Amino acid sequence: QPDRIPIDFGGTATSGIHVACVAALRDYYGLKRQLVKVHEPYQMLGWIEDDLAEVLGIDVAAVIPRATMFGFPNTKWQPWRTPFGLEVLVSEHFKTKVDENGDTVIYPQGDTSVPPSGRMPKGGYFFDSIVRQAPIDDDKLDPRDNLEEFGPISDADVAHIRSEVDRASATGRGVVATFGGTAFGDIALVPAPFLKHPKGIRDISEWYISTVIRRDYIHEVFSRQCEIALANLARIHAAIGDAVDVVFVCGTDFGTQTSTFCSPDTFKSLYMPYYKKVNEWIHGHTRWRTFKHCCGSA
């Protein structure tokens, strides 16, 4: 039996700490002065180094994907001064410009030759997705367009996961891993800020409308996504075994400030079949536990 409630700060994208808070915590605890790495630029989350994890009493170590929400890897860290005045470290592929409104825009995969996919409003502290929705013709909608970001996991991604699991395991903390590909309808992912020219249904409002009026389309997307995900999980497990304690399977929000995004019946018919398949595979083939973020909609 556990001896206490485990503490998770920074284990997943839904339990992270903003880079400004990480920097302030390092100062508060008198830790070594250093620039904080922005490992997840979409929310501007700061990487929690071992010294801070120790003083905060954090019980988990994170394994995060090789690519960020904007589709680039965190390689060759370089300094960047944020619009809110904090100097941080970002990937060499973190490419931004300030537009005519004073907003900071960021580019998918670090490619400034394509339209930006994220915007940090002037005075803001994190990025919002820029919706890049082509006109929708219901007669030509193809579920494969909403599956562009899902595919067989690459050798590079498997190698990254294996390396990061080894690093996290060496900390002695519980290993919480994000492999990707198992989030069904996560609205943060629908606009695809990591793709240069996303196709399919990418507008946030249009996606939620589609869960009502284009439900067959959504089922086709989820069904194929689930097939791909299960194959990828099998390959990941073959590479790392049961070295992971918890897998963050999905960040899809079902809660609002006042209620839920959908009824329990809709959840059971549209989403639950796919969560059930993922969880049954994990619990049937591994010793991993699973974690599902629901945004308070328990």
Predicted regions located by residue number:
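Short, glycine/charge-rich beta-strand/loop segments that flank catalytic centers
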Residues: 62-78, 179-185
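Active-site loop segments of alpha/beta catalytic cores
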Residues: 1-27, 31-38, 118-298
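Alpha/beta catalytic barrel-like cores
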Residues: 71-73, 77, 94, 116-117, ...
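Segments that shape or occlude catalytic/ligand-binding pockets
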Residues: 22, 26-71
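Extended, Lys/Arg-enriched charged tracts that mediate electrostatic binding to polyanionic substrates
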Residues: 81, 88-93, 150-157
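Low-complexity, serine/threonine/proline-enriched polar segments
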Residues: 85, 89-117
